[in-house]
């Protein structure tokens, strides 16, 4: 097992829990990356949010529920270290990583070895999972590229700033979750909101566009961004109003300091640690240089005197052309002893990466026992995401091929319902958005039922064997 990020940690845990001895290799702290700050397994380098925990209405919340059913270490650690975040599952990042580390170090079947794997694993390693993540070291990345004769794709993830809570001016800002939504561990007032007038917004956008950005290296200049983690200044470049329809949208919130005036835009900050002393700026990933960041972000009402625990940063992210290179069980077609997991495979997000680590671990455990394992049903979140990675996306409706892109879990990856719901329990017809809600709930219910059937048929039988 190479790489002790979220996917690698989850894969190692699944293998060990299945009775398979695991050697887990992690290059940190011997060799650090541009984004990591610690040597702890499962370090969160971007947001501290695992996004929505609503299993009935949201695809990522459904993925949470499926992973919990499968004994996920990552979800167990997240649940034990959650902080208030409205309808989302957010975690104390240090507590979360420490919990994962404690579990791995305490498992009798897991040996954690420090040191970099600088090329392909030795040929006598016959059951290997590579989960080295978006910042795979150059020697290993080049070895993989040489083996596959495929140029890895790459994009950037930008890191959002974190602010000390006690430096936020609450005479201008206020606590409220959008639409007062209450989530796991939350109260409905979990975000700090900073309002902007039209003039303030116009000035802010102009400053973002003019601010000095981080210089690219030659090999980074043509690297595309992933839309799910765009730097805020790149969003601003796409249109003056883009931010007002994205992370700064002023909907579902009322300023108690001036309740009769609707803000033109709103900046939200989300709790970042369990103590509640740190808050991250939601959606404010950035590649601005440090000086301009402080100057520009302190023009936000309520943040004039903000002290930053961490400023935003930028790192490159790489992933495989998985549908071409990997088989249905995440094995490299050119060398099937090597299996890949996590963000390298073209999934995007903490939960998605960990979930692919989970299924890779189950596949590797079945291989170690000399048995097979059928994939999870395509109707499940895990099966839908796996299907995207291993080729479900590759053809368009007209049969033309298109480039493989990283993907968050979403209901668009699921097979359609045989019969879409049209009526409420009382028999009246569903209208407008009610149909969308009912469809999502039906997809989620089908997914959990099908996953339970798959677990009963395959995993419990395997465990008994």
From Swiss-Prot:
An annotated Gene Ontology molecular function: tRNA (uracil(54)-C5)-methyltransferase activity, 5,10-methylenetetrahydrofolate-dependent
InterPro entries documented for this protein: FAD/NAD-bd_sf, MnmG-rel, MnmG-rel_CS, MnmG_N, TrmFO
Record field: catalytic activity: uridine(54) in tRNA + (6R)-5,10-methylene-5,6,7,8-tetrahydrofolate + NADH + H(+) = 5-methyluridine(54) in tRNA + (6S)-5,6,7,8-tetrahydrofolate + NAD(+); uridine(54) in tRNA + (6R)-5,10-methylene-5,6,7,8-tetrahydrofolate + NADPH + H(+) = 5-methyluridine(54) in tRNA + (6S)-5,6,7,8-tetrahydrofolate + NADP(+)
UniProt keyword terms in alphabetical order: Cytoplasm, FAD, Flavoprotein, Methyltransferase, NAD, NADP, Transferase, tRNA processing
GO cellular component terms given for this protein: cytosol
Gene Ontology terms describing biological process: tRNA methylation; tRNA wobble uridine modification
Cofactor dependence: FAD
Family from the record: Belongs to the MnmG family. TrmFO subfamily.
Its biological purpose: Catalyzes the folate-dependent formation of 5-methyl-uridine at position 54 (M-5-U54) in all tRNAs.
Record carries keyword NAD: yes
Name used for this protein in its record: Methylenetetrahydrofolate--tRNA-(uracil-5-)-methyltransferase TrmFO
Keyword Cell membrane: no
Compartment(s) of residence: Cytoplasm
Gene3D superfamilies, sorted: FAD/NAD(P)-binding domain (3.50.50.60)
